[in-house]
């Protein structure tokens, strides 16, 4: 099993290298998409995140958290799906992590030689956003690193979350980078090496790897350029620090603190040697400490399962929200 995890690590790590950051002059970009889709910024001051709101301002609340180096645009199809439902009003809160996809790094900036956390402070800020805006136990959906943030939010602020959906993420990525018995402490040297390599990699190497990685993360060719652009306009050191944090953080001991109904949807690892059965076993073992968790594999999809094709993902999302 752990051989499978170690092999999976190489596949997973290949999807995470990011392009060199490009300077931005505003709190976040993609404003042209906002104008087209009608969302507006939330009234919330933070140097870790900013939030876009779509849909019915009197509707039920759902928070969408994108993954590493991704923008809120990754959820546009999901937003369209939710807001088009007859008889169901949704107020959709999309998180944009500072330093990702054109947003200035601000509080997530990496200013020293040693990396500082990104995901954990973002989870705390989302909890503050929920509290200060009096959101009544919103549903939370997180993709990849966004799933990690969702787990942190639900475990560390259990009264804040009504239900949780994690998309293609396990609670301890570090298990994929070491032998049986790997712990957060024992994998720390590996995580530190990843930080150094990714934070200092030349732009050309990042661009080349990002292009190859997107081909494995998204099956639908027409959707790849958006993800590539998000990566290209992300702060390289923020992305590197966030990935290092994912490797070095073991959330398995915290899973029992989660009280919200939780579903984890995932796809088979993108390699013929990683069978659906091996993938299932990895997820079952990883989430064994979360009582009542529902695990669902989405077949014929890729890491960004909201794209490839989206109908299966929407079906699972609708089922989670209907419970």
Give short role names for the model-derived ranges:
Residues 136-178:
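Conserved hydrolase catalytic core segment
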Residues 54-106:
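Conserved HGGG/HGGXW glycine-rich cap/lid loop of the alpha/beta-hydrolase fold
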Residues 301-310, 314:
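Catalytic histidine-centered segment of alpha/beta-hydrolase-like enzymes
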Residues 175-182, 197-256:
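Conserved alpha/beta-hydrolase catalytic His-Asp/Glu region
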Residues 164-200:
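Flexible "cap/lid" loop of the alpha/beta hydrolase fold
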Residues 38, 44-48, 91-141, 145:
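Active-site loop/oxyanion-hole signature of alpha/beta-hydrolase fold enzymes
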Residues 261-301:
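Conserved loop-alpha-helix segment in the C-terminal half of the alpha/beta-hydrolase fold
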Residues 6-15:
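Bacterial N-terminal signal peptides
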């Amino acid at each position: 099993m752990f051989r499978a995890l170690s092999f999976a690590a190489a596949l997973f790590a290949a999807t995470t290298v990011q392009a060199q950051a490009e300077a931005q002059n505003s709190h976040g970009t993609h404003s042209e998409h906002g104008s087209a889709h009608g969302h507006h910024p939330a009234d919330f001051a933070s140097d870790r995140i900013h939030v876009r709101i779509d849909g019915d301002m009197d509707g039920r609340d759902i928070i969408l958290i994108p993954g590493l180096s991704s923008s809120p645009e990754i959820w546009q199809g999901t937003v369209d799906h939710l807001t088009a439902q007859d008889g169901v009003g949704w107020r959709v809160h999309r998180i944009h992590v500072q330093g990702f996809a054109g947003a200035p790094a601000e509080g997530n900036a990496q200013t020293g030689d040693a990396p500082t956390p990104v995901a954990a402070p973002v989870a705390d800020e989302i909890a503050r956003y929920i509290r200060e805006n009096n959101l009544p136990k919103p549903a939370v959906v997180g993709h990849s690193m966004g799933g990690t943030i969702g787990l942190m939010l639900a475990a560390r602020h259990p009264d804040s979350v009504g239900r949780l959906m994690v998309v293609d993420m396990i609670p301890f990525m570090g298990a994929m980078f070491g032998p049986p018995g790997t712990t957060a402490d024992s994998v720390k040297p590996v995580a530190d090496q990843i930080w150094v390599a990714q934070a200092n990699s030349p732009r050309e190497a990042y661009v080349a790897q990002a292009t190859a990685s997107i081909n494995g993360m998204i099956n639908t060719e027409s959707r790849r350029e958006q993800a590539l652009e998000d990566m290209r306009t992300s702060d390289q050191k923020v992305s590197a620090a966030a990935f290092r944090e994912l490797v070095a953080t073991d959330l398995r001991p915290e899973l029992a603190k989660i009280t919200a109904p939780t579903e984890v949807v995932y796809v088979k690892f993108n390699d013929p040697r990683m069978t659906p059965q091996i993938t299932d076993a990895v997820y079952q073992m990883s989430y064994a400490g979360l009582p009542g968790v529902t695990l669902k594999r989405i077949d014929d999809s890729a890491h960004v399962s909201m794209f490839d094709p989206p109908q299966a993902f929407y079906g699972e999302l609708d089922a989670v929200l209907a419970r």
